[in-house]
Amino acid sequence: MPSLAASVWRGILGFTCVSIAGFAPWALAGRWFHRTVGEAGLYTVCALVFIGLSGPLLHRLIIGPGSLARFYKLFSVAFAAYSVAWIIGWMSLRGHTGSLVGLFVGTAVMGWMFARAFGAPETAIKAIAALFVLNGLGYFIGGWIEGSVSGLKDLFGVALQKSARMTLAKLLWGICYGIGFGAGLGLAFHYCQASARACCRELSPRSDSHPGDW
């Protein structure tokens, strides 16, 4: 079974990869998507990429057999709810206020759904706090980096065209977002499965001697 540190690292590494792919439609073809399907359509496409790629990279955050199907069943609904809340908050209020409101409502819904799915409602507050704080840090630090890099005339002495700078800046935002949200997911899943891990240890007291098996 994964330790707390292992869950966090799995979340960071897995979701950072997912996030780079999820930000790619905006970074590489944002204007085309805006013209073709609009802002909400672009965010929907990004959300579908996040959901579709999350399973292979993150399903081992769930302990026990059948983790891939169980992960998709839970995460697809939870991330869809999170995305809807964020999109509504952002498009209604805009700016940092819209982002904060969307992030809080979205992560609150996600954390509650995780806790309920694992029959551990007492862990909801911890899961929500982990998701909101770490997601928020990754999002806003990434936004600051995106703004800084997009305004540079050169990077490490290498001149970059504006389009290249903008693409790089957006992908760097995706990396920061992935690190923060991934860490939050690792913590949230670990918190919500505390009872399940305790039961597994009682049923298999020697399992801790094989930490690499999970």
Regions inferred by a protein language model and the residue ranges of each:
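Juxtamembrane/disordered regions of integral membrane proteins
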Residues: 1-214
